[in-house]
From Swiss-Prot:
Source organism phylogeny: Eukaryota, Fungi, Dikarya, Ascomycota, Pezizomycotina
Protein name according to UniProt: LysM domain-containing protein ARB_01155/01156
Glycosylation sites: 46, 71, 283
Regions that span the bilayer: none
LysM domain: annotated segments: 375-405
The protein's role, per its UniProt record: Might have a role in sequestration of chitin oligosaccharides (breakdown products of fungal cell walls that are released during invasion and act as triggers of host immunity) to dampen host defense.
Signal peptide residues on this chain, from the entry's feature table: 1-18
Taxonomic source organism: Arthroderma benhamiae (strain ATCC MYA-4681 / CBS 112371)
Keywords: Chitin-binding, Glycoprotein, Secreted, Signal, Virulence
Pfam families, per the entry: LysM (PF01476)
Domain description: The LysM domain binds chitin and potentially related carbohydrates, and might be involved in damping host defense.
GO function term, MF aspect, one: chitin binding
LysM domain residues: 373-419
SUPFAM superfamilies: LysM domain
């Protein structure tokens, strides 16, 4: 990613870089292997382009930067325009319709020069003596009135707006009139030559996907021409430069010899990594031989290392991208063998979300409301690329967003789609028996979920004695309930399990939860606020029979049964 301040500071530079060469002096054969194409295709992609390198690279993502007059005039030369056209033609001739694989995405090789050419055409639009890109940076449209994102967040009529409880109300919906371009901009601006040219140029993009968003743009442009009493010819792209995600093709023929490895292996990836990615990931250099790797990594003797990997010649170079290397043989090598440790489970998968997320953008009918994570679609996205990014299948993505057709032709840019459902997990419970305290026998208390991580000490007050309830309590992602159990002179509790001791608390109608207690720090709960990431609470000083009422902005409230009383979070120091 180019630094954001690059373009705004370009006018300060006393020189320009007169040539663009995207791969520089990298080895063509290595690049061809990594992109799964020919060296002739890579040579065409890597040819020198007669454009200022800094502004040309920035033009490939033109909307990311603020353009000055010096930036635009440096880029927009006739030599650069001709060179970009020649570059695109050369890649078409050398690569044809043969796809390349880059970062797991299968696409036409021509998509690379087209990215730069599209940016050049947009930045270099003119109306008379004016540069439209510079003008467009000052355009302002009308504000669209929308409800705050937390307008309906609690589900409580006391706090949420009355509209939240009306059937069919959608706080993120946009009024039909607000979707019209003619309603968002003043007529003098919308009908100006630059405005129409820029909008038309967007429609000419080779990366504009077929589907609902493109149809929306075409509809708006036709509406604008009618509104402005003008006519401008245009045609949307018919080519598809993105073909989807790479799939692994299994080789035919005899399987390789079966070997057993007692140590870690370098496993092939799907899609396969390029040579550069492999060397970066495993800290080896291109051209390393098996003998080199043995000396660097293996604990086994060289004959055992070669045998474990079915290698005939120790100095044979490693040329196959999908070749797995065994570091240690099956027998116990000198110095001992490596024993892999079990993985530590941490909720990172798409299904491990325990609360409903708030969409970052409008959603359309068909997206499941029980969604743990949303993704806002941007230009160039497809169903399979979104699924690949979030580690789910396309079928799973479509099941979470049933309005999307099988061809993924109605994916809308700037709309939010669900990529992970809310996962409901039944937490196992354990029973903890409490020892006898000095002033009474404490009854068994139903306690916490099985520990996941961390360590915290919880205490209860029995008469005037502080008794440790559970030494190995755990930090968890969920909330346990609270129940009152009678003891001779004290209270036994089933405590809430929280992710972290924090700063906010929401309590209502404690119903005299603090019975027979003194003025001591205590936590008084009747409802628990579930936030998107963590639940946060802090101890407060309460009096017998008192209830604390404080609204925390934005949480979703889930009622839980409350049967008890006092929780002391290790406050006696």
């Amino acid at each position: 990613m180019i630094p954001r301040n690059l373009i705004s500071g370009l006018f300060l530079l006393p020189f320009v870089v007169a040539e663009l060469n995207i791969y520089g002096y990298l080895d063509l054969k290595t690049l061809a292997d990594g992109f799964h194409t020919t060296t002739a295709c890579i040579a065409a992609l890597n040819q020198t382009v007669d454009c200022d390198a800094r502004t040309a690279v920035a033009a490939a993502v033109a909307d990311t930067y603020y353009w000055t007059l010096d930036n635009v005039t440096t880029l927009c030369t006739s030599q650069c325009q001709q060179s970009l056209t020649s570059w695109t033609s050369a890649v078409d001739a050398a690569c044809g319709n043969r796809p390349i694989v880059e970062d797991g995405i299968v696409k036409l090789a021509s998509s690379t020069p087209l990215t730069y050419k599209e940016g050049f055409d947009l930045v270099c639009l003119k109306s008379g003596d004016s540069w439209c890109m510079i003008e467009s940076q000052e355009w302002e449209g009308s504000d669209i009135l929308k409800y705050p994102t937390d307008y309906c967040s609690t589900g409580d009529p006391e706090y949420d707006g009355p509209e939240c409880f009306e059937k069919g109300f959608d706080q993120l919906a946009i009024e039909a009139g607000d979707e019209r371009m003619t309603s968002l901009y003043e007529k003098d601006l919308l009908c100006s030559d630059c405005f129409l040219k820029v909008f038309r140029q967007r429609l000419l993009s080779p990366f504009l996907l077929k589907g609902g968003y493109t149809s929306y743009l075409v509809e708006q442009f036709q509406d604008m021409q009618s509104y402005c009493s003008t006519s401008m010819p245009y045609a949307t792209s018919t080519s598809e430069v993105f073909m989807g995600t790479a799939t692994r093709t299994m080789p035919t023929g005899s399987p390789p010899p079966t070997t057993t490895c007692g140590g870690p292996t370098i496993q092939p990836t799907d899609p396969p990594l390029s040579c550069e990615a492999i060397t970066d990931k495993y800290n080896v250099t291109t051209g390393d031989s098996h003998s080199d790797l043995h000396g660097e990594f293996s604990l086994a003797s060289k004959p055992r290392f070669l045998k474990a990997n079915a290698i005939d010649r120790q100095h044979e170079p490693i040329e196959k991208l999908d070749h797995a290397i065994c570091y240690a043989g099956t027998s116990e090598p000198p110095g001992g063998s490596y024993e892999s440790q079990p993985p530590v489970h941490q909720p990172t998968g798409a299904s491990e979300y325990y609360t409903t997320a708030i969409p970052p953008a409008p959603t359309s009918t068909g997206t499941t409301p029980s969604c743990g994570r949303y993704y806002e679609v941007v230009a160039g996205d497809q169903c399979n690329t979104i699924a690949l990014h979030f580690g789910i299948t396309v079928d799973a993505f479509l099941s979470l967003n049933t309005q999307i057709d099988e061809r993924c032709s109605n994916l809308w840019i700037a709309y939010a789609y669900c990529v992970a459902p809310v996962d409901i997990v039944d937490q196992p419970m354990t029973i903890v028996d409490q020892d006898i305290a000095t002033q009474g026998n404490v009854l068994p208390a139903t306690e916490l979920p099985s520990p996941r991580m961390g360590r915290v000490v919880l205490n209860i007050m029995i008469g005037s004695v502080v008794t440790q309830l559970l030494e190995n309590a755990a930090l968890s992602m969920d909330i346990a309930g609270v129940r009152r159990t009678s003891a001779q002179q004290g209270i036994v509790i089933r405590v809430p399990v929280i992710q972290t001791l924090a700063k906010r608390v929401l309590t209502v109608r404690a119903d005299q939860a603090l019975q027979e207690t003194k003025h001591v720090p205590a936590l008084n709960l009747a409802h628990v606020a579930t936030w998107r990431d963590i639940v946060e609470m802090e101890p407060t000083t309460a009096h017998p029979g008192d209830a604390i009422l404080e609204r925390a902005k934005g949480p979703r409230i889930h009622s839980i049964a409350l049967y008890v009383t006092v929780l002391y979070l290790d406050l006696w120091i």
